A protein has these predicted regions:
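Loop-centered beta-sheet repeat module
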Residues: 220-269
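Glycine- and acidic-residue-biased ligand/ion/polar-headgroup-sensing regions
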Residues: 14-26, 31, 136-139, 164-168, ...
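Short acidic-glycine-tyrosine-enriched beta hairpin
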Residues: 32-48, 230-242, 357-378
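Tight coil/turn sites that cap or link beta-strands
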Residues: 2-4, 39-40, 46-48, 176, ...
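Transition-metal
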Residues: 68-212, 272-300, 324, 400, ...
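Ligand-binding loop in jelly-roll beta-barrel domains
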Residues: 47-71, 163-168, 177, 187, ...
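Conserved short histidine dyad/triad with adjacent acidic residue
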Residues: 1-13, 169-181, 195-201, 320-339
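C-terminal amphipathic alpha-helical segment
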Residues: 268-340
Length: 420
């Protein structure tokens, strides 16, 4: 290495490294700890540890690696068994789109889930048959990222699902973290919708269009006129809506969308058109809890704007709970996400692609209508379209320090290696 040379951050899930300095001086940073090494010093880097090299002078080194691949440490992009949920407003269409055996009344497909009563089950590789939660418990930092594991108590903090509507959904709201912890000992539920397909004149409701007091809200719920106070949005493929906890919302019929949300299944149903459930009984309403959870703030625009540029990783949402990028690709793209210290969930919404892991050479095919989980320790990968263009979503936790200007600049810039 020449003086001043720096390497990118590396993590080897199945390899232990030994560096022996023959000549010169080098700084080797292991999991954030800097180690200064000179002639005849050696340093050992365990598997699953991140390291960076910085040559302080011209340096000659001997580097050795030992492959230690075992079942316990094997990491790769994970696919999942179908996790389908019956809904009164569901139909056969979602299973048809995913080319699964046809089932009626299917409204949701939980693509990557850590919800305890409905976790994702791994379908491929070493860990096939295990739940995602079980593997995370075995290797929390390698799977989630060190920061994510520490901040979220070794639990997957987001859920990705598909929703397909054959009828209007109930009008509902979700609590924020404070209320959810207080009332249910769970996380709150902030979410984002990405519209994959919508029939002509389909719509969603998001937010209020007029300012209401809690008393006015209660009256409108009681007399069945609450719909008149909601902001109604006609939707088209590619539309994005951010729904922070507390924002009233509903999806109309004829919409297929991907939802990224916090790991929570708490819903307060406000209005359900007087419709019975699949059991023939009226579905429960939660008007009092909803009144406590609601944010009555009126906004001018509830639709997210973002650039949908071909062959770019377009940032459409960046929040403390999760970040999401939209990637329409004609050509292969490298995605080095190691610096985020986070897992990545890739969801294919159009066509199909290969996901190729650079450190392990593992490769999977990701088809339209399916998702994969990339562990944090191997989040340096290529997305390779198979035939024509492909469109995928990336969901992850942004753990990089973010100043105000970085948040603004990141809306417009993309680097094919490390991202802002």
């Amino acid at each position: 290495l020449k003086a001043g040379d720096r390497s990118a951050k590396h993590i080897h899930p199945d390899l232990q490294d030994l560096f022996f300095v023959l000549e010169g001086e080098i700084e080797i940073t292991i999991d954030g700890k800097k180690n200064r090494c000179t002639k005849e010093d050696f340093i050992f880097v365990e598997h699953l540890k991140s390291y960076e090299l910085h040559a302080l002078t011209d340096v000659r080194m001997l580097a050795m690696g030992c492959v230690i691949e075992t079942q316990r440490t094997k990491l790769y992009p994970m696919l999942f068994e179908p996790n389908l949920h019956t809904k009164v407003w569901g139909s056969i269409d979602l299973t048809a789109w995913k080319e699964l055996p046809r089932q009626n009344h299917i409204g949701e497909s939980w693509e990557v889930s850590g919800i305890p009563n409905s976790p994702s089950v791994i379908a491929n590789g070493t860990w096939a048959g295990y739940t995602l939660n079980e593997v995370i418990r075995k290797m929390p930092e390698a799977m989630l990222g060190k920061t994510v594991a520490q901040q979220h108590n070794n639990q997957l903090p987001i859920l990705v699902k598909f929703i397909d509507t054959d009828d209007d959904l109930s009008v509902q709201v979700h609590p924020d973290d404070a209320m959810a912890h207080r009332m249910h000992s769970q996380h709150g539920k902030t979410e984002m919708w990405y519209v994959i397909n919508a029939q002509p004149e389909s719509y969603i409701y998001a937010g209020f269009k007029e300012q209401l007091t809690p008393e006015e809200y209660a009256r409108k719920v009681a007399d069945g006129t609450i719909m008149d106070a909601l902001a109604k949005h006609e939707v088209h493929a590619g539309d994005v809506f951010y729904l922070p906890a507390g924002r009233i919302h509903a999806i109309g019929k004829g919409v297929l969308l991907a939802e990224v949300q916090q790991t929570s299944d708490i819903t307060y149903r406000i209005y359900d058109y007087g419709r019975p459930g699949l059991d023939g009984k009226p579905r429960e309403l939660h008007t009092e809890l909803a009144a406590q959870a609601l944010d009555f703030t009126v906004h001018q625009n509830y639709r997210n704007t973002y650039k949908d540029t071909m062959d770019m990783a377009n940032l459409c949402l960046d929040t403390d709970h999760f970040s999401v990028r939209v990637l329409p690709l004609n050509y292969p793209m490298r995605r080095n996400m190691i610096l985020y210290d986070s897992f990545v969930i890739i969801t294919c919404v159009h066509s199909s692609c290969l996901i190729h892991i650079r450190s392990t050479q593992d490769e999977i095919e990701l088809q339209e209508g399916f998702s994969c989980f990339i562990p944090a320790a191997i989040a340096d990968y290529d997305i390779i379209p198979i035939m024509g263009d492909v469109k995928v979503l990336e969901a992850y936790i942004n753990n990089r320090p973010r100043t105000t200007w970085q948040r603004i600049v990141s809306q417009f810039m993309h680097l094919s290696g490390y991202d802002i």
